[in-house]
Amino acid sequence: MVPLLIHLPPTSEDVNSSNRDERDLTEEVLSQAQVMYNIISSTATKGFKSKVYGQRHISFEIVAHGGLVHYYAVVPLVLVDVIRQAVAAAYPSARLEEVSDTNIFSKVGKMSGTIGGEFTLKKSFVYPISTYQESKRDASRALLNALSSASREDGIGVQFLLRPAYDGWSKASESHIDGMKKNKGKKKGFGGVAPMDIMEALWKPPENNEKDGGSSSEDKQLTSLEQAEVDAISEKARYPAYEVLVRVVISSNTAARSQVLLKNI
């Protein structure tokens, strides 16, 4: 793996914000990131080895060390040129420099002052996470504010480990949507029969099949909330997908200080 330090330009060099609507600026920033991720997704390979071991992964990292915040891309040697092209295509003013590994671990705190963890999804991966437009706030700014609380003796690393998702990931989303539509109105109990249906059958006269068939389409109408969920899943399936692991590691002089920094993140 090759560590690449990303030198970021002032925001005005890549995005001219003078006399422009904020929504247009947001769309431009998102489109730049989309260009980069589309190029990275093209590195996916096919074959037996890819199915067994998965795709090659890369890592984007935000590191706070020595009172400064740095951005890194750590990539396999064979993908260095591709990542350089992807970043240059999306952010022409950015520059990548090959550097040596950075050691963020405190010599004073050692193992006792080091703490870390990883983020996990609460629901299935078919559900989208809150995007930049939906959250109505700049998550990266909140993260930078947390990193800025680190002193020169502290070390913080936030790692986004990603690789292109397997080919059939979108089929899982389609199956989930189909299941929502088919199971609408079928909240059954034991044996596929609702308990209330059993009680009603004791005194309710039988109904013909035509009436049942006519009401089935009405039962399967999704509510506005369910339809919004379907739309969100379908929207996610339109874009290239990645398997992502987000990890955080913090090292400080004391365990208590590391805990405080972790809670800030």
Predicted regions and their residues:
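Extended, folded cores of ATP/NTP-driven motor/assembly subunits in large transport
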Residues: 1-265
